[in-house]
């Protein structure tokens, strides 16, 4: 695949310098417990696979283990076996994000929110709807890419939810 990469200095010199803030978020007790259970199970599975196939042929199992651990850190509902009664309060990351979004919107800010997991964007979308916060969303399944971009650019909505894959394709 061809990827076009341009630097901000080449296309938008008027934009201020990028500000990065790293905010550490604690896992909830349920996330911590599930993470440890999954970590131990995946550790065993990965070691067994490496013993059977060798390191070079075990990459899929290793990547699957990392993916599932990342999902636990985002929200337990991203796992297939998650209990149905879980809410945003059961996710340290989602709870913190929602607090941050409300504060940013309260300051009149606008937010581009990227996620690799479209299922995480769906959870965020549900929470925004429940709070009456407007947003636009762009994922690989969005047929009309122009409308959500224009909604956000026109200031109609303060939040733009974007999947990394869709957002990297010509925005």
Task: Describe each region flagged by the PLM.
Residues 41-48:
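Cytochrome P450 catalytic domain signature, combining two hallmark sequence patches
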């Amino acid at each position: 695949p061809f990827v076009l990469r341009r630097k901000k200095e080449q296309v938008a010199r008027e934009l201020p310098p990028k500000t990065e803030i790293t905010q550490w978020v604690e896992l909830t007790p349920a996330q911590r417990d599930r993470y440890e259970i999954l970590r131990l199970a995946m550790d065993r599975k990965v070691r067994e696979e490496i013993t059977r196939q060798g390191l070079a042929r075990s990459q899929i199992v290793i990547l699957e283990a990392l993916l599932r651990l990342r999902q636990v850190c985002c929200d337990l509902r991203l796992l297939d076996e998650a209990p149905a009664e879980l809410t945003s309060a059961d996710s340290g990351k989602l709870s913190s994000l929602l607090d941050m979004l409300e504060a940013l919107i309260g300051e009149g800010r606008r937010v581009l929110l990227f996620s690799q997991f479209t299922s995480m964007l769906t959870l965020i979308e549900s929470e925004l709807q429940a709070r009456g916060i407007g947003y636009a969303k762009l994922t690989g399944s969005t047929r009309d890419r122009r409308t959500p971009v224009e909604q956000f650019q026109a200031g109609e909505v303060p939040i733009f939810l974007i999947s990394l894959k869709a957002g990297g394709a010509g925005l």
